[in-house]
Amino acid sequence: MEDVGVNNDTVHPEARAYITSLVSALGGYGVDDDGGYTLGDDALEVLRDLKRWVRFYDERTNRMDVARCLAESNLVTSDLLQIMAKWVSNESSSKYMERIAFACLEIMVPLTWPIERDSETMTVNHHRHLPVLQLAQLGYKRAIINFDVAPILSTAVRIALPCMAIPNGDRSSRDQATIKLILYFLRNIAMIAPPPGLKYEGDETQVSRSTLIDAFTFQDIFLTILTIASNMGEDFRTEDVIILDIIFHIVKRVDSSKLFVSEKRLHKIKEDELTAAMRKEAAMLKSYNKNAPTRHSRFGTMIWVKRESGKLATVSGQDALLDAATRERKMDSNKSFKPPRRARKEDMEPKDLGPRVSLDERARRQLQSFVSEFLDSGFNPLFSHVRRSLDREAPHVLQSHHSQFFYLVAWFLEAERMRKKAAKDSKNQTSTGEDVGSFNLVAEVLNQEMFITMSRTLDRAYGDKDWRLLTTVMRCFTQILLTIQEMASSGNEENEEIADNILSRLFYEETTHDLIANIVRTYKDQGFEYLDACTELTHTFVRILEAYSKENVDLQVRSRKRTRRKKKAAKAAGDQGDDEGQGDAEDDSADDERQAEKTSQERKFDFKRFALRFAPQGVVDTFVTFTKYYRDLDDSQLKRAHRYFFKLAFKQDMSVMLFRLDIIHLFYNMIKGPEPLDKSSSMYKEWEDLAMQTIRKCVKKLEERPALFTELLFSKITSTAHYLEYGHEKQTISNPRPAAELEFKREVEREQQIAILVGVLIDRSQTDHLGWIKKQLSDAESERRAWENAERALAAERPDDEVMAGSAEAIAAKTPDHVTMRPDTDARRTAMFKNPHLRLLMKLVGLERLAPTLDETPDAIWIIPGTLTADALKETISLINKAEFTPPIFDDGELAEDQLRRKTAPRKRAAYDDDDNLDGINDLINDGSDDDGDDGTGILFPAGGPTARKRTAQDEPPKKRLQRRRRRGGSDDPDADTAETDAQAEARARARRKKELEKARKIKSEMYVDPREDDSDYEGNKERDRLFFAREEERQAVKDATFGLSSRPEGVGEGAWEALVGAVMGGGDGDDGEGEDAVVGERPPKVGGRKRKSGVADLAESGGEDSEEGDEDDESRSEEDGSAVSEAEAPAAAGRRPNKRRKPAQKKKKRVVDISSGEDDDVGMDMDVDVDADADADAMDFTQSSKDGAVTNDTPLSSDPSRTTKPGGAEGSGDKGGGEDEDEDMPVAKPVARARPRARAGFIVESSDEE
């Protein structure tokens, strides 16, 4: 009955019965044969039933009952391994045995799956089964990796080999699942480890890391991992994190620094470690013997201790007789007050790392071989692919994979450095050694993408308080810095250049500096691993940054902080408080330029200022906490802490941060305490000097600053530390900014402007400012009038000849001295600096400020300049008086203050230090021009480059116009007309400059492709010139054959002459398929129903360079020219070009459009032509053909695939009348290579423009 009760408590009896019957039906050992394992009749179905039980009962109900029953029935060891061994021994077995083996794996994978303890989801069943299943998994691992009958791991891989041989794109979902199943099986075997809270009864060496590595090597599992890792991204994609998981559980907690050392060196290291451990044990025994009980301790001891106050305290125990320190410690322990204990926190150490792993020599060599091969072939592909999976947050990526990724990056980087060091020490420079000497093997974790991923994860882990992930990222960051440092000191010029580039990018972001300082400053109780990682990163980062900043004195850092400050609240009530508060609020962002300039100056890196970030008490406390483990720290860790304290106390002059009782006591105990540092340590002498110098400086400072006696008990803030160090408060210099500048919303007369400002001051109850201004102006007016009267009297008394002899300059130089505006109170002085309305009124009445805006201070002097006459001052006073008695009234109930607005400063992009000299570069490019419409970018290459172009407004000032046309019925005011005309001209000039800039940007890349093209001796240029002049000669010969003859020559028939003239001049009537357009080059395509626009806009834009052969026609037919222009405007404005019927050849006339460069602007205004559309067509890199031989260059953007070109150059589907008139003897121009479009001599006139 008790057994039944026990069964009911652990596993449901019905489930146990089903599982037991299935296991019995699977098979067993026969007695008739050789004693081997014999499968049951329905073994495959039994295995599938067992898989369904595991899957649908355990996993869905979350009970673990089936796994418990299978563990008790010893299914894996007694059945499944034997079945898989039968498949191996029988090589010629059928497909049936392969299915059997695969079904066995489908059961073993969930049985060996890692069991995680989750206090939130664990039930009573979990607490019952978990210890048993953990021990059962250890048994599975021992049986699998030590199975003598057959190699189980290689058998599992053999199942997946056919699936791996299939290309990645051809694999089915079953193939992918098979590969993942095998990899998960290998992961599970590598991951199973003895549970920390349970005692394993078997031999732990059979499940140790050394045994696992030996099994992986013997069964070629390492070769499988290398194959998959090296082909990651090509043949394998979603298996990346599984391979990462396997490698992680193979190398975790293995000391990579000892992996590549020689055997002799390794023995020496182990001897030193043993000696240090024995020495430490002797010191502990010596300390214990001081307090060890004697044979008289059974009698007991009780003593009285007399204190300074005369009170007596009772202390019991024989150890109270040793010394005063022990007695005080016992009295403290007997005190009734106990500080409250915190709740026990979760262990902060990295998850699943466990204790340090010690490998035997055989396993160490096997792992060394695997790591070397992995670094040579699989490191870059695997970690590059995993990083991309982490960045895109792939569905198969878990949170634990982030920690594993950064842990392995750090581990392999350290292993690579140790391998290089071992190869260097061995002096064995073979070909393999040369390959090892290259840092290309780990290049995928030293690129910018990796740094971005690392910085983002570092910031995210710190913000989310994921201390385990943050610890691994800090370890990774440290190893990357050490690797880059080794690259910089490798002696290879290429490696040094790469290292310099990497360091400049790492140190460029100031957010990284801030994050590291915050991490080490905010340490609390995250565990020793976190403490060790953050102090190591801080030490390495600061040390490398200091060395780099000394070599690069112009190091720049970028801060993403904005200097715009938040609006300040009004500090006090009342008129003065409102005035100042309004000034501050108005002045919030008015001085953006100065603030940006200040930020730019602060971005220049200063290592001394950067080092002060590690001086606060929080950072000191972190290193003090780390130093408290001095008995367990090695020499490198002790050196790390020593260097920090030494720099803080003696290089940064912040020794007062160490003047705290617990710190002084720690330093003293490290040297003279009961458990001091080992004197044989290499760091003992340095720590002794540091402790002595620190205590000596503390004593000396106590004599200088008696207040330090109190401050010894507390931590120091920055201001307190500064006072204790220098004896005075830290001086803070404030730079107040003047009030924001205001402007009027509408353009009004000066009288109305003064009235508005007077009304504002009256509404704000600040009439005292008006009285003060009027008094100052009145005194200045009296003084100025007296001076003017005196000057008139002197001029009247002076003879006429002396007056004539005086020069105009001397007379003009006689101006009165300026009058200084003197504020009567401090409030007035503040208002002159902070009140924007008063400042605007002072400017309107003519006052001037001596200091510029950037240098203005509250003590800046305002003056009444000597150029203001007494009458002007009197008029200003009268305007103020008038506005006081009759304030202005506005519509819709608006106030006078509503007529003003803040003067907006032009927005500027964030300026960084590397952009400070941008203006000088633009001045160089723009030839020193400073144009408002240039937007600071300038022309992207010098004008007059490889392409011939017209001169623009940037090259020379526009010509003056002799006549100015005015609108009918317009104003006769010449000033208004001039302003309007100038505005239009400026708008047109700005549009031209904009188009030039766009063109320059589009062809900049082509222009600077090959600098040899600027050389006239370059073969490419010679070839283009030769083709160009050949085409010119051919065209000139054609023109001479027609235009050079005034009449039909003798011997030539009339019909032949008309046919020749019609063929040559056929392009003038607008036919698409004939004329010179068809001969010289192809026309831009017609897309859909849209027609190509007229080329007159191109002429107006290009400046109208005249044609040599068209000059005489222009002189004789000016009227026809005008008609030609007017006729061309209509189709251009309509945006289409209709086809026209062909006219008889003898009735055609050659018409040339002549547009002079001087009338460029007028043509652009008067003609209704879409200039921007033609500019866009120019930007698409095709040149429209014309009679002077310009060639069309079709591009993928400009060519139409549906267009067909007919013989003779005809294209399109327009009316093709008179095809027999085509001139078949005219030479066809060869197309120019599309290396760079050039505009040569001649002018461009399209056939449609000749109508």
Curated annotation (Swiss-Prot):
Ranges of compositional bias, category Basic and acidic residues: 344-354, 592-601, 985-1011
Sequence ranges of Low complexity compositional bias: 1123-1136
Acidic residues bias locations: 576-591, 1069-1079, 1103-1122, 1157-1179
Predominant cellular place of this UniProt entry's protein: nucleus
Coiled-coil stretches noted in the UniProt entry, renumbered to this chain: none
Region Disordered, annotated ranges: 328-354, 564-601, 901-1021, 1041-1251
Subcellular location: Nucleus
Keyword entries, A-Z: Cell cycle, DNA damage, DNA repair, DNA replication inhibitor, Meiosis, Nucleus
GO annotation, cellular component aspect: replication fork protection complex
Presence of keyword tRNA-binding: no
GO BP annotations, alphabetical order: DNA repair; DNA replication checkpoint signaling; meiotic cell cycle; replication fork arrest
InterPro entries linked: Timeless (IPR044998), Timeless_N (IPR006906)
Basic residues: compositionally biased ranges: 1137-1151
PANTHER family referenced in this protein's UniProt entry, alphabetically: PROTEIN TIMELESS HOMOLOG (PTHR22940:SF4), TIMEOUT/TIMELESS-2 (PTHR22940)
Function: Forms a fork protection complex (FPC) with CSM3 and which is required for chromosome segregation during meiosis and DNA damage repair. FPC coordinates leading and lagging strand synthesis and moves with the replication fork. FPC stabilizes replication forks in a configuration that is recognized by replication checkpoint sensors.
Oligomeric and partner information: Component of the fork protection complex (FPC) consisting of TOF1 and CSM3.
Protein name: Topoisomerase 1-associated factor 1
Organism: Chaetomium globosum (strain ATCC 6205 / CBS 148.51 / DSM 1962 / NBRC 6347 / NRRL 1970)
Designated gene of the protein: TOF1
